[in-house]
């Protein structure tokens, strides 16, 4: 969202979920423990309106649970709480997240009635084996069918996928990304698996039946799928869980939790491009690479990891990264001697 657009989050932790996915503890992940009420909605909107500049376009967002799976009366109460603010222009629309198996024509008609603009579907994977091992309770076809229904009904569609779930491989994650691209969503969220306390996945990890999906693993596979989404022109609106006090305070006990995961992935992608560019370069050379101003830190890498890895891999005397006038994401060999 631009500076004159804002999202007002209201969390409905774990409401509506018919079963517990192995990775999920929404109260710890979202940092919210109390269910949303009409007053929660009113307070969130009024606080946001008071703090945001005049002319800001605000969208109310119901996150953290399967919104369309909660009782219709509860959905209606939350929508009705927002209605006066829609009517007077304080907010422009609503977005919500839900499960693919909680979407049907009647539900979508209700969402239209209450000015919902954006529907986020938690696909997580489009591999049936991974969905089953993760106790998702739905199939890949149900994800695809729900996504098509949402698009055909005129909503903006966001699809969420995870990496490193039980049974996942780099190949299955890439295949999920390709299937998501075929559905033509308006954006995607990518959430590498984090091991959170008080989840079945935590117990599986402790018992040795689940192998941790590390930050390094996530960076590797997310670099592959990010490239696919970039090439398809599908925006990635979030990569990795948002930091919360609970997660940062120790509830994230393993897995791919990093507050700047997206930056690490983009840095890895720049490294991979540099490796291709330098392929065949003789050893003992001095190399100068040029990148866009916005990519200098990504190309150098955290603690100069990319620069030092390139220097070591190609046995260079030195490597220097410079700002130059090229497009973001591109790399140019400026000097080789």
Walk through the language-model features, giving the residues of each:
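Conserved non-cysteine loop/helix-boundary elements of the Radical SAM core domain that shape
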Residues: 29-43, 64-193, 197-217
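Generic secondary-structure signature for well-ordered alpha-helical cores
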Residues: 26, 46, 50, 182-185, ...
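Residue-level recognition of the N-termini of beta-strands and the immediately preceding loop/turn
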Residues: 56-60, 92-94, 285-287, 319
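Short glycine-enriched loops at secondary-structure junctions
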Residues: 13-16, 191-196, 242
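Short helix-capping segments at alpha-helix termini
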Residues: 53, 84-90, 152-154, 229-233, ...
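Auxiliary Fe-S-binding modules of radical SAM enzymes
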Residues: 2-6, 12, 200, 207-337
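N-terminal pre-triad scaffold of radical SAM enzymes
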Residues: 1-30, 42, 46-64, 68, ...
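Short acidic/His/Gly/Ser-rich catalytic and metal-binding motifs that mark active-site loops
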Residues: 17-21, 196-202, 247-249
């Amino acid at each position: 969202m631009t500076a004159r657009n804002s999202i007002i989050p209201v969390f409905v932790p774990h409401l509506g979920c018919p079963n517990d996915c192995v990775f999920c503890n929404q109260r710890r992940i979202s940092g919210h423990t109390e269910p949303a009420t009409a007053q929660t909605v009113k307070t969130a909107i009024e606080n946001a309106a008071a703090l945001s500049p005049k002319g800001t376009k605000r969208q109310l967002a119901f996150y953290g649970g399967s919104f369309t799976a909660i009782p219709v009366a509860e959905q209606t109460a939350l929508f009705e709480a927002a209605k006066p603010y829609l009517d007077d222009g304080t907010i422009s629309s609503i977005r919500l997240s839900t499960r693919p198996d909680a979407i049907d024509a009647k539900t979508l008609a209700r969402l239209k009635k209450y000015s919902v603009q954006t529907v986020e579907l938690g696909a997580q994977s489009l591999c049936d084996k991974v969905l089953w091992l993760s106790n998702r309770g739905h199939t890949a076809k149900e994800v695809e069918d729900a996504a098509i229904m949402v698009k055909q009904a005129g909503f903006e569609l966001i699809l969420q996928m995870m990496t490193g779930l039980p049974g996942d491989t780099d190949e299955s994650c890439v295949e999920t990304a390709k299937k998501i691209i075929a559905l033509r969503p308006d954006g995607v969220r990518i959430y590498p698996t984090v091991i959170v306390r008080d989840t079945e996945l935590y117990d599986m990890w402790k018992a040795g039946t689940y192998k941790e999906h590390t930050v390094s693993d996530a960076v590797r596979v997310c670099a592959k799928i990010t490239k696919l989404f970039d090439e398809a022109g599908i925006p990635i609106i979030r990569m990795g869980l948002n930091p919360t006090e609970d997660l940062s305070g120790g509830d994230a006990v393993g897995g791919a939790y990093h507050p700047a995961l997206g930056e690490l992935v983009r840095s890895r992608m720049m490294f991979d491009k540099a490796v291709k560019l330098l392929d065949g370069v003789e050893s003992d050379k001095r190399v100068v690479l040029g990148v866009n101003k916005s990519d200098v830190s990504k190309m150098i890498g955290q603690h100069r990891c990319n620069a030092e890895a390139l220097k070591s891999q190609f046995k260079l005397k030195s490597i220097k990264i410079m700002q130059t006038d090229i497009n973001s994401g591109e790399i140019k060999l400026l000097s080789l001697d």
